[in-house]
């Protein structure tokens, strides 16, 4: 019971602060400096739980304020903070409730079976290809038998290409929208072709 209460309070705090203070947070990030780095990481972490601000906007803002290289590691750090926190909340605070919800959707249970069978590859490819929403993947992995360190490193590696592409594409969006769309579209196309050629079985949902 205590774990559930703590989990609920954490989620409410993250969403409330992020939602009601998002404009102030964005202004703080634009100001630059050490505190703006912290604000950016916390806002991205909150965004994992609830899309307070479009992820691409935060990534682009980080690139513009801190530079592409710094923007990438700041965005990645914030994203991983939110990701691992949600994973642990799903595993230890809301496991029973979330399990009942997942059981109502056979397709999601099939994906969970894939995570249990080949955890690192499944999580890695799930990050590279956003077939499953990130929030849903975090919860499913928290409910599954995936070890936290496997989930962490697979997510870390899998998030890097997307964050790099989104940061670069987002930073150029105002000056060249076509270029930004082309960069991200090409990235998605390449990944899809790799999966189709090398891992076609991972595109199929197992039948019961």
From Swiss-Prot:
Signal peptide positions on this chain: none
InterPro entries according to UniProt: TMEM64 (IPR015414), VTT_dom (IPR032816)
Keywords for this protein: Cell membrane, Membrane, Transmembrane, Transmembrane helix
Protein's UniProt keywords contain Membrane: yes
One Pfam family from the record: VTT_dom
Membrane-related topology note: Multi-pass membrane protein
Chain segments annotated as transmembrane: 5-25, 41-61, 69-89, 123-143, 150-170, 176-196
Keyword Transmembrane helix: yes
Compartments it resides in: Cell membrane
GO cellular-component term (any): plasma membrane
Main location: membrane
Protein name, as recorded: Uncharacterized protein YqeD
Gene that encodes it: yqeD
